[in-house]
Amino acid sequence: PPVVVGINAPQGCGKTTIVSEMQRMLEKAGHQCVVMSIDDFYLTGAEQDALAARFPTNPLLQVRGNAGTHDLALALRTIRALTRGDDGTSDDCVRVPRYDKSARGGKGDRAPEGEWSVV
């Protein structure tokens, strides 16, 4: 069965560095490994804009990163699919979303599905 490892720590403490090294070591040992970040589950750019417009006086919803700015349903579907080994599509692969923070002039947007990781 799959093993899921979650890392939670403050910004700038080395999570990406640790995870990159773990991935390298696991793949070198012959294990299939996928890395994802909570950032990969931000709302799409259009959804972010709609949320900000719906709550114009809430500064926490004007930018990504705060509670309420993630697609939790997509995150749960993806994690469940990874632990089951398929995402319900006919090819039995799991598509892991990616988020492009540089899109829309730095406001960010979910990357097109063609750029998602497939395992």
Language-model segments: which ranges?
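Extreme N-terminal, non-catalytic leader segments
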Residues: 1-6, 10, 31
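Conformational switch/transducer regions in large eukaryotic molecular machines and scaffolds
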Residues: 98-117
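Hydrophobic positions on the alpha1 helix immediately C-terminal to the Walker A/P-loop
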Residues: 18
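Post-Walker A helix-loop "phosphate-sensing" segment adjacent to the P-loop in P-loop NTPases
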Residues: 24-34
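Active-site signature of alpha/beta-hydrolase-fold catalytic machinery across serine-
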Residues: 21
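Conserved lysine of the Walker
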Residues: 15
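Conserved nucleotide-sensing/catalytic segment adjacent to the nucleotide-binding pocket
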Residues: 34, 41-103
